[in-house]
Amino acid sequence: MQKLYVGCSGWSYDAWLGHFYPANLDRREFLKYYSQVFDFVEIDSSFYNAPNLFMIKRWASVTPDDFRFTAKFPRLITHEKRLSDPEKEFRYFFDVMRPLHHKVLALLLQLPPSLTAKEGLKKLRAMVHMLDSDFRYAIEVRHQSWFDKDVYKLLSDNNICLAWSQLDTIQTPPELTSDFLYLRFIGDRSIDEKDFGKVQKDRLKELKRWSDEVNRLKDDIKFAIIAANNHYAGFGPATANSFRKIVGLKEVQWEEMKQKGL
């Protein structure tokens, strides 16, 4: 493994003000500040609405050259159209993301829990030929029927990563289907957004278990992506730091930056 990227799912959280961000930091400066602390972020907002070119170009310009992103495909593709005839939406998303492609580690298809392999596998087979070769891809499934050898073969044949997801509703098997890993610490929706600035749950045992799985496959992958959601333990940056510590990476420091208002 050449590189382990550890960061958060999203960065635009007002609840982080005074905890991660300086209390008076302008929201327009959030990403620039975040990228001075972590070297990776998952773009969560693209799931709700595809970003526009202005936003993408700005994200590229305010982050360091070695900063990296992942981005979710819009829910229009996965949840509303349920993978049916996505070519038009794919083309738009790829065109929008292209100015950032040199910083994009992977694009993520997050499927809804109601989408079974029986309904979706045939659509997925047709869809893989529409994917732009400029990007790498990962897929997160939330129905047990997808954990099947035929699905794994399709993903492996196309170097599409089966994302490992720590959810309270389903357990993803640690299958390797690509030359990289994508691990997402998601949790549930029991933590209120106003409490996102502090840790609410002890998840260390789970973090350790998943770190062992990453370590098990380190010689088989080029890189690994670790994304920590606020809903997982209450404070994404702290979860990311805990994982870094477990795997032997130096913890990132934001307190000194925050006090200086950098």
Briefly describe each language-model feature range.
Residues 1-262:
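Residues lining hydrophobic/aromatic ligand-binding pockets adjacent to catalytic sites
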